[in-house]
């Protein structure tokens, strides 16, 4: 990844993070004012699409969560494939510390959540909710600190987020899959085979991949496997090194095209649709019920503890080293910001928990509280660490 590419990516993600904050606040406002009936009614409006004898009928909320988020995971898959083949995930020394940090950052929050919800079987399956990180939101907070945050720390956060997303993909595939339809899975496998035949034969016409990708999405949607995984499979079939007639990489071109649409459109829409938690009737004791407490504690306590402690052990055992020029104080601030789960945590909550409004609101409350505490604390810690760096630089 070139320096200019990194700068462009950071600029885009930072702006998207600020937009996500606005979408979240707007959703909470709509859910707690007389506009709530309009907000809820809009999201429950049913839309139908017909393909001959095939009919897909879903509320708008599910079109967003199953359809638009498949495009988000398509982008994630493109980024993961490129980084594995040519980028920060292509060699062991580069991946060592982010990999160790990612494991700690997913394992410890899940353990904290499980411990708190151990006596509540209905919510125990939500253990993966606090294991996620919202990279756009985290970079949006970092953007508020200006240019003083070290570049290597931002790059480390990007690499950690990519591994975090990869972990989320594996978790969704393994643990949050419903009853399976054999016929739909067979058709999906045929679509996957077709995609990789296109890849191996050097086809660079995007329309061919899109048509098979849409067919794959429909098959996966009907199969019981979550439809967003179709985006990941499609991404891994898109060729990186095969050039089109203009000499461009199809994967890089598609990634560059999708990124602003995802950052400025899909993620804010998802945040607006899923962050609208009603605060009416919520008491202080509700915050300490197992579900919201487990999520909030996992995000705020578990994320920073897992990332920092696992990384410290890795550095002490000489398995990895800190990013160049980054202090442990700055690293800790970044680790706290990784507790901003927001969009990814909300998404996993829609898969992991039952569909009742009460459960959904409790999960949203936990995600919002944990993410808010992580954002405020991470901003303060990182700002203080960056200020210390500036003072050391000015000292004679």
UniProtKB/Swiss-Prot annotation:
It is found in: Cell inner membrane. The chain crosses the membrane at residues 18-38, 60-80, 95-115, 126-146, 155-175, 178-198, 201-221, 262-282, 295-315, 333-353, 362-382. Keywords: Antiport, Cell inner membrane, Cell membrane, Ion transport, Membrane, Sodium, Sodium transport, Transmembrane, Transmembrane helix, Transport. It is a multi-pass membrane protein. Its main location: membrane. GO terms for molecular function: sodium:proton antiporter activity. It holds the Pfam family Na_H_antiport_1. GO terms for biological process: regulation of pH. It catalyses: Na(+)(in) + 2 H(+)(out) = Na(+)(out) + 2 H(+)(in). GO terms for cellular component: plasma membrane. Na(+)/H(+) antiporter that extrudes sodium in exchange for external protons. Belongs to the NhaA Na(+)/H(+) (TC 2.A.33) antiporter family. HAMAP family: NhaA (MF_01844). This is Na(+)/H(+) antiporter NhaA 1. The lineage of its organism: Bacteria, Pseudomonadati, Thermodesulfobacteriota, Desulfuromonadia, Desulfuromonadales.
